[in-house]
C-alpha cells in the first residue's frame, strides 16, 4: 500500500471524507474534532549486502477527538483489518489541546 492509497482509504471512513490530512493542518484550518492525521514516522527496511530489498515505512495514523471516541476507533480498526494491515495502538490525552490522541502504528 502507498501513502496515497492509505489517504484514500482513510477518507472512506464514515464522517472523515474531509477530515484526513498528511502530518498537520495548516494553522487555523483544522476542522472540528474528530479528525485524522497520518505521517511517516520511521522506516524498517529489509535489506542485505548493503542493498534495500524492501522499503518499509512505519506510519502513524492519529485520531484526535474531544472525548474518548470508541466509534471512530472501531471504524479505523475495521478499515485496517479489512485491508489486512497489522496495527499497534497507543492513547494519550493532550492537556494543552484538551483532546484525546489515539495513535495507530502500521507498516506500508
Can you annotate each of these PLM segments?
Residues 63-67, 106-108:
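Short beta-strand-to-loop capping motifs
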Residues 9-16, 75-83:
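Generic non-transmembrane alpha-helical segments
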Residues 1-43:
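Small/polar-rich, solvent-exposed N-terminal microdomains that initiate assembly or binding
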Residues 80-93:
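Low-complexity, intrinsically disordered Gly/Pro/Thr-rich segments
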Residues 1-9, 41-48, 52-56, 90-108:
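Short, charged interaction patches at domain edges and termini
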Amino acid at each position: 500500500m502507498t501513502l496515497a492509497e492509505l489517504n484514500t482509504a482513510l477518507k472512506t471512513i464514515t464522517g472523515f471524507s474531509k477530515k484526513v490530512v498528511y502530518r498537520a493542518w495548516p494553522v487555523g484550518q483544522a476542522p472540528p474534532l474528530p479528525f485524522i492525521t497520518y505521517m511517516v514516522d520511521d522506516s524498517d527496511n529489509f535489506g542485505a549486502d548493503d542493498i534495500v530489498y524492501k522499503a518499509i515505512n512505519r506510519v502513524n495514523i492519529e485520531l484526535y477527538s474531544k472525548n474518548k471516541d470508541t466509534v471512530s476507533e472501531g471504524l479505523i480498526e475495521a478499515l485496517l483489518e479489512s485491508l489486512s494491515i497489522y496495527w499497534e495502538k497507543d492513547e494519550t490525552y493532550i492537556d494543552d489541546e484538551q483532546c484525546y490522541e489515539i495513535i495507530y502504528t502500521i507498516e506500508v
